[in-house]
């Protein structure tokens, strides 16, 4: 197993159909990642896949290349109706469904297949209009897919390829009954190409694979290095009093090019967002109750570099590929050890290095033993000098739940706060 992100194997060597290869190369991909090099040859021979790989290792392109190649080499049923897609790709979140769709666009164009999206929270009529015209590939979340299915807008009787992405997250969010409902309305497993991908493959996920797939090949990439060799991990033990000031101080010292800060609650995220915004950072807030259009706009701005910091709950921790994230902060240690791996997996992607900083505060330090047991290593501890923390921070204009000590020198100044070195703002 190569220690580098890319292998010496190129997509051109795999035997992909020319149209698929053109779509892959249109996205700038030439050499395969390990998960791509191991799974695509199996998919081209019709093997079912249950694949495990760290986030950011290219599993989306792996299953998309396998899917489009299968469509080109296998004819649709002669009895297939307009409302019957040939492919169903299921994702746990709206954001991931949209991301998969966007990643698939070059291949859909080069191969000549139509795609549709189905996810809740936004765009019902627009999605409906596309589906009524007929699609080859349907990508979406289970709830909206079932909604269209029960209305007769779509029918799954002609499905030839099914993909389940982030399967462990499906369990976490309680979607497994929905998934089984959809599987029962498809042709039997032996008549489909089936793929299941996840950053972790627990026993329950493997049981799901064997229940609804045809002798799946279990592919596991770098299981021993769960948190990524390119991620520098660091742990602080701040008091609740120092916690916000420590975050602001570290942000001031490092000026991350692109950072994601995770908190465990919506209110916690709102507080962190307010303090960073008051301190002059270009920061976005992503929590579960942010409207869908605004969520997508925030992600687009963060990806494009219009925002430097994203404060989020775990809604953004799984599946999303945001390139060039230099820092991840666990402002709160997560309650679920798997979420720690998924959170810090936002950085150190595509062969780049990353920095993951975690706070074991008075409220969440008890989560640390489970995290270190799950990752099979202790997180290196760093100390800080409380007297060296920032002492002239700008108070947010709105009232927030997190109060800094009254002896700190907070000034309610009208300036835009600190600015990134190099005159970036």
Curated annotation (Swiss-Prot):
The lineage of its organism: Bacteria, Pseudomonadati, Pseudomonadota, Gammaproteobacteria, Aeromonadales. Residues 243-390 form the Helicase C-terminal domain. Residues 416-425 have a biased composition (Basic residues). It holds the Pfam family DEAD. Residues 40-219 form the Helicase ATP-binding domain. One of its GO terms (biological process) is RNA catabolic process. ATP binds at residues 53-60. Residues 405-425 are annotated as: Disordered. This is ATP-dependent RNA helicase RhlB. PANTHER family: ATP-DEPENDENT RNA HELICASE RHLB, ATP-DEPENDENT RNA HELICASE RHLE-RELATED. Keywords: ATP-binding, Cytoplasm, Helicase, Hydrolase, Nucleotide-binding, RNA-binding. The keyword RNA-binding applies. A motif (Q motif) lies at residues 9-37. It is found in: Cytoplasm. Belongs to the DEAD box helicase family. RhlB subfamily. One of its GO terms (cellular component) is cytosol. PROSITE patterns: DEAD_ATP_HELICASE, HELICASE_ATP_BIND_1, HELICASE_CTER, Q_MOTIF. DEAD-box RNA helicase involved in RNA degradation. Has RNA-dependent ATPase activity and unwinds double-stranded RNA. It comes from Tolumonas auensis (strain DSM 9187 / NBRC 110442 / TA 4). It catalyses: ATP + H2O = ADP + phosphate + H(+). A motif (DEAD box) lies at residues 165-168. One of its GO terms (molecular function) is ATP binding. Its EC number is 3.6.4.13. Component of the RNA degradosome, which is a multiprotein complex involved in RNA processing and mRNA degradation.
